[in-house]
């Protein structure tokens, strides 16, 4: 793992296409473990952050590889199980094919998308410091009983 510096805001513009979004740069086990602890400790808080981003309204996709056999604690709500199992995460537009690179609308759309993703970026960026690991580990053990 490269550490928490792997959380990014990204925009790419190339002759072959363009894209933008937020997420982790490759697999970051330490940060994702911390996010998993946060999901267990405060599922409503994590859900609220995700809802604040209006991913569907902004036509954003959540991507990333997942652990196939990771045991998800019984208390994790169904709508967060996919997030819990992620090895890495990135959120980007469904499609940018119809966006004209020379259009003033591009700047507006990228700005709006980054503003909408801000709560999720801050959740990922602050995952390590959000909850003391000792407290969360106790909660996880309690849920497994």
Go through each PLM region and give its residues:
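Short beta-strand element of the conserved SAM-dependent methyltransferase core
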Residues: 1-2, 91
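Short, small-residue-biased leader/transition segments that mark boundaries at the very start
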Residues: 3-8
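Charged, low-complexity intrinsically disordered regions
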Residues: 13-145
